[in-house]
Regions:
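Bacterial N-terminal signal peptides
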Residues: 11-21
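Mitochondrial intermembrane space
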Residues: 3-6, 20, 24-184
């Protein structure tokens, strides 16, 4: 496999596994569901690790690394869904990137010399990109929230200005409606 193909493969793996992390942004998880998800991840890890027992040398190491990575990602995703915050989702994406890096690094052990060095550097680059993307996603969400708030404040000021044209009870009613609508 050429370096370019390996790099594309690694990037595809990282993107494929980190993007679903953000898919559950709106859904929460109860405490019992969270506990069950962690238990399920641990059980799946044990089952996957058992399947690695028949392998030898680096193939076994890669298999175990993949099983550990799957467990780490499943637990991180469960925690992110349970906490249901941008920070938790970012942490899950970072955990996924690091787990994928560990697997990729283990796969590089089959190579020798410069090929191995290049493989490790490419794996590290993919990890770094995935972590940067996870952090950027949180920053974008924060900027969008700030923009939403700024727009709401501007709309509130317009509504209050419109209320100034009224007088008495109508003005009070208009102002109260604007305050309720824009949560000011």
């Amino acid at each position: 496999m050429t370096h370019r193909k390996l790099n594309r493969l690694l990037e595809g793996i990282v993107i494929g596994l980190t993007v679903p992390t953000f898919a559950f942004a709106a859904a929460g998880m109860t405490s019992s569901e969270y506990s069950a998800a962690k238990d399920r991840a641990a059980a799946e890890y044990k089952a996957a690790k058992t399947q690695c027992d028949g392998l030898k040398a680096n193939a076994k190491d890669v298999c175990v690394a993949e099983a550990k990575a799957a467990e780490k990602k499943a637990k991180a995703n469960a925690e992110a869904q349970y906490k249901n915050t941008e920070k938790a989702r970012q942490d899950a994406a970072i955990t996924a990137a690091k787990a994928d890096y560990d697997v990729a690094k283990e796969k590089c052990d089959d190579k020798k010399g410069n090929d191995k060095d290049v493989c490790v550097k490419e794996a590290k680059a993919v990890e770094t990109k995935a972590i940067a993307d996870a952090k950027a996603t949180q920053k974008v969400a924060s900027v969008r929230a700030d923009a939403r708030e700024d727009k709401m404040k501007a709309d509130y000021k317009v509504a209050m200005e419109k209320c100034d044209a009224l007088s008495g009870a109508a003005k009070d009613s208009c102002q109260n409606a604007a305050k309720a609508k824009y949560k000011m």
